[in-house]
Amino acid sequence: MYVCLCNAVTDKAIRNAVRQHNPHTMKQLRELVPIGTDCGKCIRQARQIMVEECGTIIPMHEVA
C-alpha cells in the first residue's frame, strides 16, 4: 500500500528500511526513505509503521 503518494513510497519500503537500518527517530527514517518532503500527509502513517516494526526488532543482547 502506498503511504506517500507524492514520492510513491510504500509501507513495504518503510518496513524494509526500518528492518535494515533500525532508525530511532523520524528524522533518521526520512534520511532513508523520501517521506514527508512534499505535502506531509504521510508522516503519521510512516511513524506508526516505524513504531510497529521497531517492536519486532530483537535487540542484539537478547540474541546471544
Swiss-Prot record:
[2Fe-2S] cluster binds at C4, C6, C39, C42. InterPro entries: BFD-associated_ferredoxin (IPR052371), BFD-like_2Fe2S-bd_dom (IPR007419), BFD-like_2Fe2S-bd_dom_sf (IPR041854). GO terms for molecular function: 2 iron, 2 sulfur cluster binding; metal ion binding. It holds the Pfam family Fer2_BFD. Its cofactor is [2Fe-2S] cluster. Disulfide bonds: none annotated. Keywords: 2Fe-2S, Electron transport, Iron, Iron-sulfur, Metal-binding, Transport. Binds 1 [2Fe-2S] cluster. It comes from the Bacteria. Transmembrane segments: none annotated. Gene3D superfamilies: BFD-like [2Fe-2S]-binding domain. Monomer. Interacts with bacterioferritin (BFR); up to 12 Bfd proteins can bind to the BFR. Belongs to the Bfd family. Required for mobilization of iron from the bacterioferritin (BFR) complex. This is Bacterioferritin-associated ferredoxin.
